[in-house]
Amino acid sequence: MEYRVLPHGGEQVSVIGMGSSVIGAQPEKEIIATVRAAVDSGVNYFDMAGGHAAIFAAYGKALEGIRDKVYLQIHFGADYTSGEYGWTTELAEVKRSVAWQLEQLRTDYIDVGFLHCLDEESDLAAYQANGVPDYVRALKKQGVIRHIGLSSHTPALVNKVLDMGIVDVVMFSINPAYDYGQGDYGIGENTERYDLYRRCQREGVAITVMKPFCGGQLLDAAQSPFGVALTKEQCIQYALDKPGVMAVLPGFGNQREMREVLSFFDASAADRDYSCLGELAPAGASGRCVYCKHCHPCPAGLDVALINKYYDLAMQGDNLAREHYLTLEKRAGDCVGCGHCDSRCPFHVTQSQRMQTIQTYFGA
């Protein structure tokens, strides 16, 4: 397992966590066994937004004695008191549902408390009018919540909440389909979505990724908007390469599916490579570096993807990105203009020219 740090807190989080959207259909015994197997495999981050209320009691049993070794995302607005998933912005219902979730989970604290499913302006307005954000902030002040988060599919709404300055974690849907405007949740232009990822990294807001496989559609050529099937390894690597991403949270339906997802760590760089998207993505994606590293290795020793990432972040106002860039052993000024990267870039970025632009910007 690999781990990344939650910037506002310092927790070490597994880069692959576990979503709970599908496992609720399993018997309690299988849920408990899968959660424990995940923990034994190094998974320490779990999202609790699922379609079934049954997951909570099962998780409570599975995590007994090891609660302090894992991190739970709990959603304010997801209501399970009826036995099935429901959504509410009413404060009394939010309080009742969260209290029920904590009781079932056998815990008295929340690692990340999420404002749940803000996809429209009216959602945020309703939460605010009913005092839900104030309630979440009060619980954080009391120590019940350690971090405040937000789950959304809409970049504009995420930016609006980021402006409030209360969020440490954003749960957002990242996959090639959505980033290129395909699918029900492909909300926002490609540039708007990438700007959001960079803003999160710049401000130290961690992104946890939901729907990395686009609900399984990307794994099936017949359903994929690209007309070809991608692999789980490609989708996971795609998400992990995006600025600000801390963890990817695919749903495991059972232990077999968990092992399949975690085999990502045994996959070769070639197996994880998603540069085929350069030939599949819409024309609007052409000419932008997506940090896929298909141009690597550089004959002159440059980390072309990282140089591009630092430049893009600096252009968004991240002063730390400039400092990080200047500490690189090889910088854009070391480019010899051989054209190796230009010929290999599946997104048709003329990297040799871009290195000149970056050298001029940073002065090195």
Task: Label the predicted regions.
Residues 6, 18, 46, 59, ...:
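Conserved, mostly hydrophobic/aromatic
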Residues 69-72, 166-175, 268-275:
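Short hydrophobic/aromatic-enriched beta-strand-loop microsegments
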Residues 21-23, 49-51, 75-79, 115-118, ...:
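Active-site beta-loop-alpha junctions enriched in small/polar residues
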Residues 39, 43-44, 191, 195-364:
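Structured C-terminal cap/extension of enzyme domains
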Residues 40, 86-208:
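Glycine/proline-rich, positively charged
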Residues 1-74, 80, 108, 141:
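N-terminal binding-site loop/beta-alpha segment at the start of enzyme catalytic domains
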Residues 19-29, 76-95, 121-125, 220-229:
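Active-site mouth loops of central-metabolism enzymes
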Residues 53-59, 155-159, 258:
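Short, well-ordered alpha-helical microsegments
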